[in-house]
UniProtKB/Swiss-Prot annotation:
Its EC number is 2.7.8.7. This is Holo-[acyl-carrier-protein] synthase. Its main location: cytoplasm. Belongs to the P-Pant transferase superfamily. AcpS family. Transfers the 4'-phosphopantetheine moiety from coenzyme A to a Ser of acyl-carrier-protein.
Length: 141
């Protein structure tokens, strides 16, 4: 393991932020994330996206922790969040897709890596944990 990151999102506050007139907050989500969220009615949309937002934050925190003692490769205000996309398989298990431009920056700073992701919801909260590990070649993959 290289490092771990976690994030917790208050869903009602997140929903309020999404609903603000003129808000461009949806731009932090990739097309696939927005498409999946649009299939959920009402607050389920915000709940779904809150988990995805927590996952993106958890990834950035894990990456930042991996280079502890060094300046961030990308200042937080310059992160292009849509380059970090959460996808799910048909059973709902989640993984991260990191766009090639960002993936290159991550690999240049920490080496060859893989991610493990978990998202959970309980009541008014969504949480995510992201673990960065060194990539290891396996025969069974």
């Amino acid at each position: 393991m290289i490092s771990i990151g976690t994030d917790l999102v208050h869903i009602p506050a997140f929903a309020d932020q999404l609903a603000q007139p003129g808000s461009s907050f949806m731009d932090v989500f990739g097309a696939g994330e927005r498409r999946l969220a649009s299939r959920r009615a009402g607050n389920r949309n915000a709940e779904h996206l809150a988990g995805r937002w927590a996952a993106k934050e958890a990834f950035i925190k894990a990456w930042s922790q991996a280079i502890y003692g060094q300046p961030p490769v990308i200042p937080e205000e310059d992160v292009q969040w849509a380059l970090i996309e959460v996808r799910a398989d048909r059973w709902g298990r989640v993984a991260l897709d990191i766009a090639p431009s960002l993936d290159t920056q991550v690999r240049e700073s920490i080496g060859d890596y893989t991610t493990s992701l978990s998202i959970s919801h309980d009541g008014d909260y969504a949480t995510a944990v992201c673990v960065l590990s060194y990539a290891v070649a396996t025969e069974n993959r």
